[in-house]
Each structure stands twice: as structure tokens, then as C-alpha cells.
Amino acid sequence: MRRKWRSEDFHFVFFGVLCLLLIDRGKLEQVKHSDTYCVFQDKKYRVGERWHPYLEPYGLVYCVNCLCSENGNVLCSRIRCPSLHCPSPVHVPQLCCPRCPEDSLFSVSSKITGKSCEYNGTTYHHGEMFVAEGLFQNRQANQCAQCSCSEGNVYCGLKTCPKLTCSFPVSVPESCCPVCRGDGELSWEQADGDIFRQPANREARHSYHRPHYELSPSSTRQVVNVPRFPSARSNRGVLPDPQQASGTIVQIVINNKHKHGRVCVSNGKTYSHGESWHPNLRAFGIVECVLCTCNITKQECKKIHCPEQYPCKYPQKVEGKCCKVCPEEVPSQSFDNKDYFCGKETFPVYESIFTEEGETIRKIAVETEKPPQIEIHVWTIRKGILRHFYIEKMSKREFEELPYFKQITRTTSSQWKIFSEGEAQISQMCESRVCRTELEDLVKVLYLEKSEKGHC
């Protein structure tokens, strides 16, 4: 199941961009047995393979096509739909563009691949969307839970529904929010608040579960509630304003260990049953000496009592811990002369900006270790609109010969992953409008800064 697109939301006549790169069959045979492949959102693709990106919690975006080129670069482009001359075009599942009714009888070439999901006894296909009942116990009357399935994991969003102007709204399968009759064909380009974008504080939480980036079934979830990419320097999560006019997404990943799907929400962050965390008070920051635990849907907090006597003579106070620890328990800080941020290794980020005849080519590059190479993300911007982006890779030696790059910051692999995922979303979002702010906010995701009182 997917979001339907309506042609009247677009302002220009669109022509199909169905072929990103013509690859000769002979060349394909030459690389078939080579080690060349592309990596996009942690998934490997063979040379010549095409796919639609997956955006949480909307599912597969059929209006963006990605291709793995022969040199291992990922090329993504929007599909531009032609204008139709029939009065009532219809939308076909798994396709981007609407069709005239007389042309709608054809086979769908796209195949859904990916692991299915199980939620509350129901099996959902990869990319399928559905509505969850009883997931958020403390939701407002105008909020609902929208979920989707991706590679065996369930992604859910607490969505604040926009105010409706009609007297008799109707339900549609693509959204948990009711809509006015005639608005059932939801467009991707709805109100800005209803567009999912990755935040800078995706890892800015304090629980005893490992950070979620592998999308494994046992992983925890992360709260998202931002109308645009926030700066990496702002790490506070805020619950949605139920009075706002546009929809809002608070995204979580359901822990498959707890099939009931009940969660606790604390300070804008979502925790599953049994998960523990230290509360974050605005005036004091993280309170290490108070421990909260999610019990089904209720928070149970208690004070941590430190021992009166320690096995060592001179226990030390360690940042981020409530009780003192003995010196032999203090973790070593030797990091092999590498730069670290909050215990995570950082990598240099480079930037190059070239402007000519009203067109700006902006390149963001990062140095990776596995494999040791430089990954460069290239944006083509014309009059503030992101027209095209692609990814290229080169060796470190080749990169060092380029004179026009300068280092702008250092970042972690997790922040670089957020940046990479955000490109596909911004490309879709900024199809026909100026997105200077969104692009700048996306770059800010790469900048690192400790939160209040130096906590990570």
C-alpha cells in the first residue's frame, strides 16, 4: 500500500524519466562476476539494478528511481508524470503516475521485495502501510498511529491530523487521518508538517539499549517530531502540538519483542515495555540519579541509592554516572590517536561549492575506513531548487589531488547515515520549490556538539 499521487498537485507538464542510464549488455556481462556493487541505506545492489527508495513511515516512494551504475555510484532521479487528458485519472498500485481508465489495464512490472512484518497477529508486506490501534495511550483526540513495514520491521508514527473544512469526512486506506471527500488521493506534497524528515537528534537519547541503525528486529526506536531538518546543535525532542494546522509525524520503530506494541513517551522520546532511561529535565539536564522504566504504558521512576562504602580507598566521580566508581572501573580513554565524539570515532567532512551561469554544484565528501575511500555527494542546484543529486566514490589518493575541497567539520558514521538518507527525501520534497533552508539544515546534521552539561 502506498500514498497516491494526484496530478493536479503538480505545476508543470511532466514527461517520464524512466531511463537514468543506458547500460550496454556487453558491459553488464563484464562486471557480472566482479566485486562492484552499490550501497544505499545499508543495502547492497548489483550493477544495473534499479529500485525505489524507502522513506519512513511512508513506505516505498514509487516516484523516485535509483540505479546502481557500473562504477559503483548511486544515481537517483524523480519520475516526471505526463499530463493526462482524461477527466478522471486513476492511480495504480506500485506505480508513480496516474493513468486514464482505458489505459489502466496492464501488468505491474514492479515487484515488492523485502521481508514481511508481523504486528498484532497480522502479516504485512514490505512497503505496506496500516493503522495501529492502542499504540499511543495518551494521544490527543485528533491524533492517530500510522505504521508501515520495511524489511521485517514495523515503523509507526503518531500523526496529528489537520483540521478539516467539510462536515462529513471519509476514511482512506493511505492515511489514519480522515479526509474530506475528493481529497482521498493524498499527495506527497501536502503540508510541510506531514513530510517525514530525518532529525539531527536521531541518536540523542539516553537508554540502556544500543542505538538503532541496523534496523534489526531487536532494536529500539527513536522519536522524531520536526517540521524540517533541525540543526545538530538542537537535541531536544518535543511532542506535537495538537492545535497545529498541518499533520505531524512522531516516528518510532516497534520493538518486535513486545507484540502488544505498548509504549511509554517521556520528554518527547518513546520507550518500549521494560526499557529504562534517565529523565531529562530542562533546568538540570540528564538526572543520572533517577532511573525510569516503562511498565506497559506507565513510567515508573525511582532514585538510585549509591553505596556508603566502596571496595577501593578513593572512588572517583565519573561524568554521566550517578555513583562513584573505583579507578580500575573507569573506562580507558586511549583511542589510538583518533578523534572521538562521545566515544564514537569521527571522520573528516569536506565541502566544495562551484557556481557558474546560475547553477551551483555543491559537493559534500566524507572519508570512510571500510572500505578506505572518499564518498562524494554531488548536488546540482538551480535557482534554489535541487535539480539532481548523485553519489560518486574515489580513492583517497585521487581525492587528495583535488584542490577545491576544504574540511568543514568532523562527523560520526551515524550522522553521515542520516545525511545520506535525507538526500532522497529532500529531492522528493524540493521538486518544484526553493529549498535553500532544508539543504542548509541537512548539512548541519553533520556538525557535532555535546548537549547541555556535556552529556552525550
Swiss-Prot record:
A GO term, aspect molecular function: BMP binding
Compartment annotation: Secreted
VWFC domain: residues covered: 36-101, 115-181, 262-327
Leader sequence residues: 1-28
GO cellular component: extracellular region
InterPro entries: CHRDL1/2 (IPR045717), CHRDL_1/2_C (IPR045716), VWF_dom (IPR001007)
Main location: secreted
GO annotation (BP), single: negative regulation of BMP signaling pathway
Pfam families: CHRDL_1_2_C, VWC
Keyword annotations from UniProtKB, A to Z: Developmental protein, Glycoprotein, Repeat, Secreted, Signal
Tissue-level expression: Mainly expressed in the ventral retina.
Glycan-carrying positions: N120, N295
This protein's record includes keyword Glycoprotein: yes
Short motif Cell attachment site, span: 181-183
The keyword Glycoprotein is assigned to this record: yes
PANTHER family for this protein: CHORDIN-LIKE PROTEIN 1, VWFC DOMAIN-CONTAINING PROTEIN
Function of the molecule: Seems to antagonize the function of BMP4 by binding to it and preventing its interaction with receptors.
Protein name (database record): Chordin-like protein 1
Designated gene of the protein: CHRDL1
